[in-house]
Amino acid sequence: MAQNGSVLSRRRVLQASTGALACPFVIPALAADTLVVNGYGAEFQDIITRTTIEPFQKKFGVQVTYDNTGSAAQNYAKIRASRGAPGFDVAGELTPPELILGQREKLLETITESEVPNLKYVWQKSRNIAPPTGVVHSYQYLALLWNKTHLEKPASWANYWNPAPAYGDKVKGHLIAFEPANLLSVYALIMAAKLKGGGVENMQPAWDLLQAQKPWIGVSVMASDAAAPYFENDQVWLAPFWSARSGYYVAHNYPVDFTIPQEGTIGLANCAAVPVGAANKKLAFEFINFRLDPEVQHAFNLAYRSSPGRPDITDWPADYAATQIVTEQKMARVDFPDSAVIGSKRGEWTRKWQEIMS
C-alpha cells in the first residue's frame, strides 16, 4: 500500500477510458455514451475499475468517467445543492439515510425491476432497510481493527472507547477518530452509547465516552481511505473500521486484524442511486444492474472483501465466507439501526461531536 502522497494521488479523478475529468462541485454534462459514476477512492477505486467498470465498458461499448470525491453524506449534499443534477449519473456509494432523504426530497429516481431486473435476486433485508430510491449492491459491518504487533485482541467496544483498563498508557495517541460525515463514526458512537445503556434514542453516554477518550486520540479523519497510511506506518493501533477495508488490509499484509466485539455490531448497506437530473439515466440503470450480475458480484466482493448484494451466490472460498454475510442466517444476526432516525439526528450528532473535539 502506498504512503500518504501516493494514496492522495490515486484519489484524483480517474477517466476510466481516455482523458481526465476535473472535479469541481458540479461536473459538466458529458456525451450520451459517457457515464459518470461517483464512488470512493484509493484501493476501492482500483478494485471497482478492474472488476466492474472495465468489464461494463467492454460489454456496452461506452466510456465511464469515475469521480472519487466525497463521502455518502457529502455526495448527497451535492445532489441536494444541484437540485438533483450533480454531474454524476450514478451515486455509487450512498447509504440508507441518504436514500430516505432522496425519497422525501424527490431527488433520487425510484428504481424497480423494470429498470434493474437483477433486483429480483437481492436480499429480503435490502428491501426492508432501504427505500426504492436506490439498490443495495453490497454489505459491510462495523469491525474493531487492532495492530497485532502492539496490542492484544480487543474483546469489547469498551477497549476502544475506554482503552486504559485494557492497554494502559502505551496506547495513548494511537487511536483514530472519524468525523460523523462518515457513517462509520455514527455507528461507532451508537456502539459507545450501547455500552452504557443508551442507543440511537439516548446518545449522551456516547458523548461522555468521547469526551473522556479525546486525550487518547492521535489523529482524526473523515474518509475511511484516509486512515490507511496511519495503519501502515504504525501510528494507529486501534480503530472502528468497515469490515471490507479491514479484510483488504489483512489480505495485503498490514500488521492488523479485525474482530466483532462481544457486544455485537452494526451492518452497513452500500447503495447505488440515480439522481433525478442525471444526464444518462438509461445507462445508469444498466450499470446498477450490471453490479448485481453474479460474475461481477463475485469478482468485486472477493477483491474488496465486502459481502454480496444477493444471497444466491454460493461458490465463495471458505476463508472469505467465514468473515462475510453470505447466508440468511448470518444476515439475521446483523443489527441495522433505524436509518430514518439516524438521518433525522445526524446533524445534531455532528454538531455535538464537533463541539467535543474542537
Language-model features and meaning:
Residues P97-L101, E232, W237-P255:
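A ligand-binding cleft/hinge motif common to bilobed small-molecule-binding domains
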Residues A143-H150, M191-K196, L268-K281, I288, ...:
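A bilobed periplasmic-binding-protein/Venus flytrap-type ligand-binding module shared by bacterial periplasmic
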Residues P317-S358:
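Extracellular/periplasmic bilobal clamshell ligand-binding domains
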